[in-house]
């Protein structure tokens, strides 16, 4: 159990730091649409699509790697709670267009990139 806890702990810390860096690097470009949160969620959507295929098709991988990547790193990187407060802040300020745009970009972008990640990994690991 301890190796699983360490895998999640380290992965989550690294994912959260990357999310913070994305915010520092991108949020100032369009203050009404925090691009750091969007980038974190889109990158996480793509990466989890790849990870889902890899960890399903590669049964020999230690379970701690799945915990490190999906539960830890991608759990720390992606952020539904920050996304939610950004949407609600716009809505409560009467900025319904921005609230809708943020919501739609996160949801459609994440689903699209998750599918793209699954397609990418399936192409990489397809039997010859």
Swiss-Prot record:
GO-annotated cellular components: plasma membrane
Predominant location: membrane
GO molecular function: fluoride channel activity; metal ion binding
Activity regulation field: Na(+) is not transported, but it plays an essential structural role and its presence is essential for fluoride channel function.
Topological type in the membrane: Multi-pass membrane protein
Record's function text: Fluoride-specific ion channel. Important for reducing fluoride concentration in the cell, thus reducing its toxicity.
Protein's UniProt name: Fluoride-specific ion channel FluC
Gene expressing this chain: fluC
């Amino acid at each position: 159990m301890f190796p699983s806890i360490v895998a999640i702990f380290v992965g989550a810390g690294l994912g959260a730091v990357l999310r913070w860096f994305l915010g520092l690097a991108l949020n100032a470009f369009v203050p009404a649409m925090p691009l750091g949160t969007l980038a974190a969620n889109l990158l996480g959507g793509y990466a989890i699509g790849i990870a889902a295929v890899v960890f399903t098709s590669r049964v020999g991988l230690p379970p701690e790697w799945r915990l490190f990547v999906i539960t830890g790193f991608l759990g720390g990187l992606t952020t539904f709670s920050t996304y939610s407060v950004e949407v609600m802040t716009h809505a409560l300020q009467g900025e319904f267009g921005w609230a809708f745009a943020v919501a739609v970009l996160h949801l459609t972008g994440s689903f699209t990139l998750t599918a793209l990640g699954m397609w990418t990994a399936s192409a990489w690991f397809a039997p010859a």
